[in-house]
């Protein structure tokens, strides 16, 4: 799929066209029609998954941090290919556990441990090197501003459209809200980083830049 690099109205329309082309390929390859009912059910399910993942990240704002960055990253990496309902259930169960840890004052590192935000390139399995380096050096990773982090779950897809065209437009609009590094100009990403630094009370930011990405 050809991802637009700007967010003008014509870029949104271009992305709508890409989604429609992808839908046609999926239907031809699988022999299954993508109906409004099926698309609505999938949208609702994936919105629930986003909310569950967001609950876990909200817990990471606590000090002491109730979960290591490496464990949180593994959850996000698995979310890309796990069954969506199972992922939602397990993420909510994890959030329940983390909320109890916060209430009990339990953390993976002492309160006051330096808090790091990783930004930039997504980190796919088995890429845990940056988290390992940070967390074996006396700090804790509390947030990832990348596609295996906040970009994956921020912003819900509008569930109100009842026809396929409206649903595809809702999908396009949701994904265009992401401030991916491929967009230009990209002041929105700077705003996101500043917001996340405040929300997660970070002491430092490390920008991860995967060569050739």
What are the residue ranges of the model-derived segments?
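Trp/Phe/Arg-rich N-terminal binding region typifying the photolyase-homology
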Residues: 1-36, 143, 147-148, 153-213
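A charged, amphipathic alpha-helical module
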Residues: 16, 24-153, 159, 186
């Amino acid at each position: 799929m050809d991802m637009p690099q700007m967010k003008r109205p014509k870029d949104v329309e271009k992305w709508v066209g890409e989604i429609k082309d992808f839908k046609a390929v999926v239907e031809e390859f699988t022999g299954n029609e993508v109906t409004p009912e099926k698309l609505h059910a999938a949208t609702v399910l994936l919105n629930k998954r986003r909310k569950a993942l967001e609950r876990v990240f909200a817990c990471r704002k606590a000090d002491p941090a109730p979960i290591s960055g490496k464990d949180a990253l593994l959850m996000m990496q698995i979310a890309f290919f796990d069954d969506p309902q199972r992922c939602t259930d397990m993420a909510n169960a994890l959030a329940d556990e983390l909320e109890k840890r916060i209430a009990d004052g339990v953390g993976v590192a002492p309160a006051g441990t330096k808090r790091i935000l990783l930004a930039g390139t997504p980190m796919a399995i088995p890429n845990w090197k940056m988290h390992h380096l940070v967390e074996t050096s006396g700090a804790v990773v509390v947030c990832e501003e990348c596609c295996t982090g906040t970009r994956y779950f921020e912003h819900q897809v509008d569930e109100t459209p009842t026809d396929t065209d409206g649903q595809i437009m809702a999908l396009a609009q949701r994904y265009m809200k992401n401030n991916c590094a491929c967009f230009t100009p990209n002041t929105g990403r700077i705003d996101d980083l500043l917001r996340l630094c405040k929300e997660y009370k970070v002491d430092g930011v490390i920008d991860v830049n995967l060569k050739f990405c």
